[in-house]
Amino acid sequence: MENLNQETFATPFVFKTDWKNALEDEEFIKVFSSDILENYIINKRWYGGKASTLKYIEVVDHFKITSKKNTYYGVLLEVNFKEAFYQHYFMPLAFMAEEELDTNTIIAPIQLGNQKGYLVDALHQEDFRKLLFDNIVQAKENPELKLIFHKGSKFDDKEYKSSKFMGLEQSNTSIIYNDAFVLKIFRRIYVSTNPDYEISRVLTERMHFKSSHAYTGSI
C-alpha cells in the first residue's frame, strides 16, 4: 500500500494526550495546525489557496462525533495568507492504530501516549461515512455536536448498505450512498448558506420541481 505523506515525516509526532481529548490539548492543536497541516493541505485538490502564500493555519472550531468503533472530529480551519486574507476549510479527522490502517490517505504518523498510529481523513473510513448516513436518517438534533442533521421529505431509505466516492474531489468530496443518494461534503466553507443546498431544497420542498435531483437531507 502506498502511504500518502508517509515519506514526508520520517518519525511520528508524539503527544501525551489520547485521541478522545486531542482537540482539547494545546500542544496537539499547535503541532497539528503548523507542522502537520501546512505540509498536507497545500497538496490537496480542494485547497483553493495555491496561488497565494500561506502564512499560518488556525483551528477555529471543532466537533466530536462517535460511533461504536471510533471517535471522529470535524475541524474548521482558518487558513491565513500573507496577502492579508483568509479562507475557511472543513476537515474530518480520524486516528487509526497501526494494525487497523486500511487507507492510503495518511495525513501524518502520530503517537498518542503509548499508542502509535496515523492521523487520516475520516471520509476515507467507511465507519465514518455510515455514521453520517445514520445520523441523517435519524435526524436528531444534538446541541453538543454543534450540528443539525436534517432528513428531507423525499428521503425514504432507512438502512445503510454501501458508500463510495464519486470521481475526483475538487472543492468538495461527493459520496454515493446505496447507489442512490449523493452527499456533497464541501471542503471550503463560507459564512453564508451554500447556494447548492438552498436551491436544491427550495426546488424539492417548495416548488416540487421534478426535473432536478431531489433534496433528501443535509448536515
List where the protein language model places each region.
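Contiguous mid-protein beta-loop-alpha structural module that forms a pocket-lining wall or clamp
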Residues: 1-10, 60-63, 73
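Short Lys/Arg-enriched alpha/beta "domain-start" segment
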Residues: 10-54
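Conserved ATP-binding subdomain of kinase catalytic cores across diverse folds
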Residues: 61-219
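Short, compositionally biased low-complexity segments
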Residues: 2-19, 100-113
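C-terminal low-complexity, glycine/proline- and small-hydrophobic-enriched intrinsically disordered tails
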Residues: 1, 49-66
